[in-house]
Amino acid sequence: MRLKEKDRRSLDNSVISIPNLRLKTILDTLEDVEEVWYAIDLSAFSSKKTLFDYQKNALENAIKGLYYFYSKCGGNKEEFFENVYKGILPETLPIRNKKLIDLLKEEGFVVDENKLPTYQIINRMGFWMATGSGKTLVIVKLVELLSGLMNLKVIPQKDILFLTHRDDLIGQFKGHVKEFNEGRMPSKIIQLYELKDYEDVKSGLDNPTGIPVFYYRADLFDTEEKEKRVNFRNYLNNGNWYLILDEAHKGDKDESKRQTIFNILCKNGFRFDFSATFTEEIDFITCAYNFNLAEFVKQGYGKHIYVSGENLRSFNRRDDFSQEEKQKILLKIFILLTGIIKAREKVKDRVHYHKPLLLVLVNSVSVDDSDMELFFRGLVNIAKGQIQDSDFQGAKDELIQELKNANFRFENVRLSREFLNLLREITFEDLLESVFNSKSPGTIEVVQIPQNRQELLFKLKSGDKPFALMKIGDITPWLRKKLEGYEIVERFEEENIFAKLNEDEDINILMGSRAFYEGWDSNRPNVIAFINIGMGEDAKKFVLQSIGRGVRIEPFKNIRRRLEILHKNSQIDKETYQQVKDWTTPIESLFVFGTKASNLETILQTLAEQTEEEETLGDLFEINPEVQGKLLLVPEYKESELILRMHPEDKEIAREFLELDDRILVCMFDVHPKVLIKLRNNLDALVHAEHQERKIGIPEAVLKRLFGYFSVKFR
């Protein structure tokens, strides 16, 4: 049930296909949502975490979407389609696969002449959120929201199912749920069950006291049972699922069948899609909230992105390029990395940035003349010092000339004159010390970790610390064929270098295949080189996910916004900012290199499609004229009481009902007696009456919000 992809014009004509986010456009302007729908606290997550504004905005649009579907349209899919999507989405979707047609008809869908009326699968909304934006926290809060709205009887009672396509993502979800549950009353915690336990839970053998949520691997759903694969019919639940999908697309030959199964599972429920890489037109049109890579970067949560005009075509094994050409491009990349490392050295006493890293992602690893092998050969030659001074100077001059007028994606950013001058002063000895951890050239030595079949370390014999890590599926072919003649030593003190790469500042280069990069989170990448990644939708998704994982920034512990934004928000003092500002842009940037023109266009196209409208960074932020030119100090924090803002009438409702007997309130709301004591003794200090706050007016909803907020906050 894929919509036909619209033809896209060439970037050469400067025409970019901007997705139509129809549902988001409507929800952003929807203002008549009844107050009861906002009865839960959207910001509280745990004693250590609260949601960013953009995460709360995602939940607010989830509320608006559910309100529109269930309250304004009465849960009627045809009415929802007519009101929101008529004339935007086609009335019917063609289905050419007879097995899918039979499957849909079997489960009660109407399919006429191989066409499915679109309204039948329109009970859905998507959340287009960048890798690294914390969408898992939003998913956990969405579970709490659904439970709260079901308890208030404003949406139907249904079971909740969470699906994602990898075990590590399930593990990540479990970890966030565990943190969310800490300190909550039993009825408020989320209880996770593997989907195979569904019958036990529903039959009462395992009786949950909290919010039951089922989970499973999305890619293991099928039409028959086999090993870990499950027959979806055994968990059909009459289509009454609130189905939450997190990156639940694998892109293989069974994708269409799985998407059909997902639509069947939520036929009488609702579907929530979370992804950093939407590609189908229906995903964009039904998108309720957008905080994609472009928004993530523009609002200062990620690094600036620069896509180099330099062409890595010399690493295409099918073409005959000279060793000098390979050497020049590697020199440019290494000089750039050296410059960023040196910039970080200048500010690290004041701002605790990551250690910059070069990430090399290749398509082939072990075949003859593989992408990895060609890159490694070039690395070896430079490490040995087999370059002419004129070649080094030429590479440096070309790099500086390119960076002088560098056009960063999404923003109007320029590298400082100070940084460009620093690049001019870099010597080959600086490069050896910064990149290769050595003061002089040398031959490469291979460091193997016994029992570790996926990692190899590389160091220069002239140095004392490894400088590079290779992470691939199996190192055996490399040891046997590619590294013949190299000295191989064994290292016993570490079993998994990759797992500790964020803390290990010695490693400056990470080389890996496409497969290894899934699920890796790090602030460290400043340069990414894609070598022969291919083209098409799969390559675009990989590029987007890779760049998304490389843009994370954390100048101070647990503060994940760029320094300029922190300065404008008065989170650092003016003196500190003035001392480091000339060096921050390269450290807060991700420089992307691609193999050849077609690959580079894939990257450009992917990034261009992330932009809804033309904006510059200056358009997004305003400096308060009252504070311009004045000293902005770093605030010092002290413990203070928590404050909940409520409409005055809601506060009076709370005051009145707090006079009820403890046993009644504990029984009705599962609130801890200590919370009741705290609220009775300090209500005026803890709850501020403000007329601009939404009025709820329903005692049950007011008390749920009050107790929910302070039950989490009081430790």
Regions found by a protein language model. Give the residues of each.
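Helicase-associated low-complexity regulatory tails and linkers flanking the ATPase motor
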Residues: 1-9, 45, 60, 70, ...
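Accessory nucleic-acid engagement/destabilization modules that flank
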Residues: 1-37, 44, 50, 122, ...
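Active-site-adjacent bridging/hinge elements
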Residues: 24-40, 100-120, 139, 304-309, ...
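Conserved SF1/SF2 helicase motif Ia
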Residues: 124-126, 130, 138-169, 173
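Conserved glycine(s) of the Walker
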Residues: 134
